[in-house]
Amino acid sequence: MNVDFIAGINNLGEKIYTCEPFKTSFQNPFIVALIITAVVLVVFFAICNPPVDKKRKTKTAIYVYICIVALLFLHYYVLNHQLNDIYNKSNMDVIVSSIHDKYKGGDEIIPPISPPSVSNELEEDQPKKIPAGPKPAGPKPADSKPASSADSKPLVPLQEVIMPSQYNN
């Protein structure tokens, strides 16, 4: 499995164990809801003495069971939403940190690369031309004008001069 995914699951487990409202070590929210419901029922029976009459006892038992089921669903719903929020936040943290580690190389800051200018691209795309044959001996005067097209030698692309075997095949 992916190491980032496993690290994210471990991080999520730590956040579930330290759930703020309940501070519980149970991972299953249904068990937590059951414990909270049991505590509520104990308090309910401690405050309200159960009736002695058998008919009233049955009605009270039905109401108590309805209350138990309602409280279970309520606690499960609340806990489930809290755990989903925790999962979504930690999952997003894992995604952001894995993207940061993958493309930025950890804490290392990489400066942005500026795109090359248009003039540089045009110069690089066209091969440089140099005259074929040996260079004339002696220094060239600075104010001399180029020879006419009839006197000049044909220009050969620079790549052919440097690596002729690559282009002749």
Swiss-Prot record:
<keyword id="KW-0325">Glycoprotein</keyword>
<keyword id="KW-1043">Host membrane</keyword>
<comment type="similarity">
    <text>Belongs to the asfivirus B169L family.</text>
</comment>
<keyword id="KW-1133">Transmembrane helix</keyword>
<dbReference type="GO" id="GO:0016020">
    <property type="term" value="C:membrane"/>
</dbReference>
<keyword id="KW-0426">Late protein</keyword>
<keyword id="KW-0946">Virion</keyword>
<keyword id="KW-0472">Membrane</keyword>
<feature type="region of interest" description="Disordered">
    <location>
        <begin position="107"/>
        <end position="169"/>
    </location>
</feature>
<feature type="glycosylation site" description="N-linked (GlcNAc...) asparagine; by host">
    <location>
        <position position="88"/>
    </location>
</feature>
<feature type="transmembrane region" description="Helical">
    <location>
        <begin position="28"/>
        <end position="48"/>
    </location>
</feature>
<keyword id="KW-0812">Transmembrane</keyword>
<protein>
    <recommendedName>
        <fullName>Transmembrane protein B169L</fullName>
    </recommendedName>
</protein>
<dbReference type="GO" id="GO:0033644">
    <property type="term" value="C:host cell membrane"/>
</dbReference>
<dbReference type="GO" id="GO:0044423">
    <property type="term" value="C:virion component"/>
</dbReference>
<keyword id="KW-0244">Early protein</keyword>
<feature type="transmembrane region" description="Helical">
    <location>
        <begin position="60"/>
        <end position="80"/>
    </location>
</feature>
<feature type="compositionally biased region" description="Low complexity">
    <location>
        <begin position="140"/>
        <end position="154"/>
    </location>
</feature>
